[in-house]
Amino acid sequence: MTTRHYVKPFHCNPAQPCYCGSGALFGDCCASVSERREPPQGVVIVNNFISKTDCRRLVRYADKQKAAWLMVRDDKKSTPGKSVEKRDSGRVTQQVEMDKHQSFLNDFIRRALLEVASRKFGAADFFEIPYLLRYKVGGKYGEHADSETYDPDKSLFYRISDRDISVLIYLSFDFVGGVLTFISLIYIYHPSAGDLFMFTSGNLFMHQAQSFTRGTKYALVS
């Protein structure tokens, strides 16, 4: 039996002290609704981390590649001896087979960790092999935390992944929708080609990619 490692959720009360240690209230600091606010503590954005030329080259290649829908276990059809999967209604996106270009994706993530994450979060022991997601019209990724999930019986989160930092690199130019929303932090990010977006993977940083209304978006994930 696997032991669950439970994590107490942050209070998310705007009238209580912020998690960042600034001494300010949460609602006046990392969850501020001000239009001139900075990104919350734990979010790092580097514009043009990847050149537009590299973005276009990877998108041209990805457009020709096969892709598979993200799946989830179908508990109604699965048996102890056979696991059956189905399309996940909350994750309407495809993982692209990058084949010979996978080494380029690995190098981008490695550089992000060495040049950016090491200064902001500390040195990484390892990184997950990155994969490329393709979102088309109607595509979305529902609310979730990357490394934790919620146990309603205990009113606590528990770890499901050995991930401390999430890394996204956006490649696409012509799309509408798909903004990245952090619910508890009241923070919205509009992706742009070449941008590196990093954030802490725990429950405070629960997020969702909203539905796309036009075009195709590619996002490199690790």
What label would you give each PLM region?
Residues 18-20, 29-30, 55:
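Disulfide-bonded cysteines in secreted/extracellular proteins and peptides
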Residues 1-11, 32-198, 204-222:
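Fe(II)/2-oxoglutarate oxygenase catalytic core
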Residues 25-33:
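Cysteine-rich micro-motifs
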Residues 8-24:
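Short Cys/His-rich zinc-binding micro-motifs
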